[in-house]
Amino acid sequence: MFLAQEIIRKKRNAEALSKEEIQFFVKGITDNSVSEGQIAALGMAVYFNDMTMDERIALTTAMRDSGTVLNWDSLGLNGPVIDKHSTGGVGDVISLMLGPMAAACGGYVPMISGRGLGHTGGTLDKFDAIPGYQTEPSSELFRKVVKEAGVAIIGQTGDLVPADKRFYSIRDNTATVESISLITASILSKKLAAGLDALAMDVKVGSGAFMPTYEASLELARSITAVANGAGTKTTALLTDMNQVLASCAGNALEVKEAVDFLTGKYRNPRLYEVTMGLCAEMLVLGGLAANDADARTKLNTVLDNGRAAEIFGKMVSGLGGPADFVESYDKYLPKASIIRPVYAERDGFAYSMVTRELGLAVVTLGGGRRKPGDALDYSVGLSNVCALGQPINKDTPLAVIHAQSEAAFEEAARAVRGAITVSDKQPEKTPEIYQYVRAEDL
């Protein structure tokens, strides 16, 4: 028998907790036998004294097992269950293409996603822009769509990882969100509860990233790779660039349009293509669907070019209640803003740098993101045709096109865009889309 206060005392004194102590405490978080004050105290003790990798693995698996863990064995799937998770960014629409692409190559992708908060957009909010699409289907429908389409992107159900819900809300209120140990357990407990064989992790770096520095992003990537593999799920983390908007746009309906255009080959933003391919190829290799990165990329290009990935996206949308002809006719279903107008720079030159976070917040200001959980969204608003770094800027090439519902909102967003993008006489150095891979064998 353990006492919560003795577990807190041990961690306060910078001692390592045993697997059994961690399991006891997580059970207490779940069944409310541990108080909010005790959870806050342990969170603060971990924040200051950290956890070993063994402690992180124990915390992650205990939180994963605090609710339902999905099991796909009964469906008789003829391929691996694989997924991707991103720490979040601006214009990060990768999931919408990557899920169908991986499914078209023989994987099964049960992607449980979140809503946006602050400057980062949420994958679920993008799907809410599609009329009829159920982001919270019954577990029977979720399993049916995963089996038949190969991919289903839905929201977290109430019976998955209840320990994380309670722990996270307390961390949020007590300034202990920024602990790498706790971030690792929070992210992975949710992902691993989906019953995955393999996971590719997208850890963002730069001015639109969740972690403040490259070093912090790298530390998180290493922690996630070590803990996920330690918990039995093959995982690689990629450090990818978020020093500019990833897609050409930011905003829910706008990003859905860009994702469909990417899948059908109408338009593929080169940066978005590179990061999507890197993550998706890693999923195929980890899942045993491709021999190596080059083999995986060949397979992925094939399913993009022959239309199979686009077809699977359509199958997922209709399977979850959306329009059957969405891929062909998205224009008649996606909402449009009443004001669609470019914003220009005050001088000519090159797009030199971008405070990506501020562009994400401009979308929030327009009504396309949340200031607090539960806020209603306007799916039509946002930014499109966002300039790329290094691009020439003059009176004919705008910084971006703003989609707004009022003149006042347009003006406020225009000020934010001008303030977030620096135009200079010199061109910036080109940065890679993918900085590095963190694989299990590298640790």
Curated annotation (Swiss-Prot):
Molecular function GO labels: 1,4-alpha-oligoglucan phosphorylase activity; thymidine phosphorylase activity
EC number: 2.4.2.4
GO cellular component: cytosol
Key words of the record: Glycosyltransferase, Transferase
An individual GO BP term: thymidine metabolic process
Cross-referenced SMART domains: PYNP_C
Family: Belongs to the thymidine/pyrimidine-nucleoside phosphorylase family.
Function as written in the Swiss-Prot or TrEMBL entry: The enzymes which catalyze the reversible phosphorolysis of pyrimidine nucleosides are involved in the degradation of these compounds and in their utilization as carbon and energy sources, or in the rescue of pyrimidine bases for nucleotide synthesis.
PANTHER family in UniProt: THYMIDINE PHOSPHORYLASE (PTHR10515:SF0)
The name this protein goes by in its record: Thymidine phosphorylase
Species this chain originates from: Shewanella amazonensis (strain ATCC BAA-1098 / SB2B)
